[in-house]
């Protein structure tokens, strides 16, 4: 027997028993974004490697350690996308969507990072992302946060997520803060592991979200980024907080929140939860006003967020016990037997699908006697079985059997079966 081939570690199948909750969550994401007037954009999952190196930052963990990168046959370096913002900006520049325009865009799909697989974090994972271009003021930052808060209500998780906010200011303000932070951290090098020492040299702000408990304690006395903000960033952040206060969105200001990608400036935010054990991020984002120009476009401000669907779905399943999922994949199961019944059965099945498209109709195609077919019908979870034998075909009739309610089966004229089904599924 040949050795079986299995999925790559950290890249998981989504089975038929799992897809209904995915479809429900995805539909809530789509409908919420549509209600705010956002438009879908779809980008390739493979991009030229320099796109991510330039956008995300050479010294970030994502670029230096986590990307799936390979050379194609022309020896060009390509990368499976680790996030969606860079590709969305690239598409916007390439197709002339950004210059002197406002755009509100969203996307959904797989991303790839070479991480150690664990619950809610995989090497192939899925994100829903939103990117807004051409709007500089704090109102759009607020809209994105209000939008996510509405989505949490739609998903039934609003009591289990907390909004954390920070402003990381301009590039100049951040450079000044970086110098002060490095000077402070020098006295704690002895507490750092090798990875943290490397971050101290290359990307010291990333030490602020360390999991090292001793270092976390020391960081309580570290300089605060908010104290180094430029006036424009300070006013922008104050305006955002005022809007959120006025519309009743609760938040915590987290001075250690910096996000893991280099392109952010001013506002950064995360929605976090403790309902899955240790605190985990469900959604994160912020402003990236220099990214479009950095990638070769005209100077255009931007702001966005992304949410990891695997972790979001884990949270939904953990705290929302009233998800309206279908109990089976089938509503009507059509069975038939006899020499000349197949054609009539196909015609009936198509008639039902045409006139009752909201009902899911499955036709038995694997043969066998009626007893065997009824077993399959019961196993399918269908509410109704439609039965055609030679006599029914000859008399233009169909037998309707209630598989769940125990009602007596009825013989119905073929021309009346649609009305009969409408009544059955209204009850």
Swiss-Prot record:
GO terms for biological process: histidyl-tRNA aminoacylation. It comes from the Bacteria. Its EC number is 6.1.1.21. It is found in: Cytoplasm. It holds the Pfam family HGTP_anticodon. SUPFAM superfamilies: Class II aaRS ABD-related, Class II aaRS and biotin synthetases. The keyword Cell membrane does not apply. PROSITE patterns: AA_TRNA_LIGASE_II (PS50862). GO terms for molecular function: ATP binding; histidine-tRNA ligase activity. The keyword Nucleotide-binding applies. Keywords: Aminoacyl-tRNA synthetase, ATP-binding, Cytoplasm, Ligase, Nucleotide-binding, Protein biosynthesis. It catalyses: tRNA(His) + L-histidine + ATP = L-histidyl-tRNA(His) + AMP + diphosphate + H(+). It is an enzyme of class 6 (ligase). Belongs to the class-II aminoacyl-tRNA synthetase family. This is Histidine--tRNA ligase. It comes from Mannheimia succiniciproducens (strain KCTC 0769BP / MBEL55E). The gene is hisS.
């Amino acid at each position: 027997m040949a050795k079986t081939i299995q999925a790559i570690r950290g890249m998981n199948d989504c089975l038929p028993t799992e897809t209904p909750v995915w479809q429900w969550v995805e539909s809530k994401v789509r409908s919420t974004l549509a209600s705010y007037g956002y438009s879908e954009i779809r980008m390739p999952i493979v991009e030229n490697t320099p796109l991510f190196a330039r956008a995300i930052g050479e010294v970030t963990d994502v670029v230096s350690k986590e990307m799936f990168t390979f050379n194609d046959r022309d020896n060009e370096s390509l990368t499976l996308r680790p996030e969606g913002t860079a590709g969305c900006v690239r598409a916007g520049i390439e197709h002339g969507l950004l210059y002197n325009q406002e755009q509100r865009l969203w996307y959904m799909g797989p991303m790839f990072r070479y991480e150690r697989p664990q619950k809610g974090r995989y090497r192939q994972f899925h994100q829903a992302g939103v990117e807004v271009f051409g709007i500089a003021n704090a109102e759009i930052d607020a809209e994105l946060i209000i939008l996510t808060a509405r989505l949490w209500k739609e998903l039934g998780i609003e009591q289990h997520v907390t909004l954390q906010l920070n402003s990381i200011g301009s590039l100049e303000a951040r450079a000044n803060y970086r110098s002060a932070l490095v000077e402070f951290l020098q006295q704690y090098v002895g507490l750092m592991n090798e990875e943290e020492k490397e971050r101290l040299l290359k990307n010291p702000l990333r030490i602020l979200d360390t999991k090292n408990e001793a270092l976390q304690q020391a960081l309580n006395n570290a300089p605060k980024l908010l104290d180094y903000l430029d006036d424009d960033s300070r006013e922008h952040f104050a305006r955002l907080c005022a809007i959120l206060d006025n519309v009743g969105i609760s938040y915590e200001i987290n001075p250690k929140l910096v996000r893991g990608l280099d392109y952010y400036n001013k506002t950064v935010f995360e929605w976090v939860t403790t309902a899955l054990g240790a605190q985990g991020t469900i959604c994160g984002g912020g402003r990236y006003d220099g990214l479009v120009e950095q990638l070769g476009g005209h100077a255009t401000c931007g702001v966005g967020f992304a949410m990891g669907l695997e972790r979001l779905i884990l949270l939904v399943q953990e705290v929302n016990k009233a998800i309206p999922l279908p109990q089976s994949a089938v509503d009507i199961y059509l069975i038939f037997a006899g020499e000349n019944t197949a054609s009539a059965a196909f015609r009936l099945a198509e008639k039902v699908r045409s006139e009752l498209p909201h009902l899911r109709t499955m036709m038995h195609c694997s043969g066998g006697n009626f007893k065997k077919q009824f077993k399959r019908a019961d196993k399918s979870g269908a509410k109704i079985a439609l039965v055609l034998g030679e006599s029914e075909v000859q008399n233009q009739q169909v037998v309707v059997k209630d598989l769940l309610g125990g009602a007596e089966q009825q013989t119905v004229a073929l021309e009346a079966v649609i009305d009969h089904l409408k009544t059955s599924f209204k009850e």
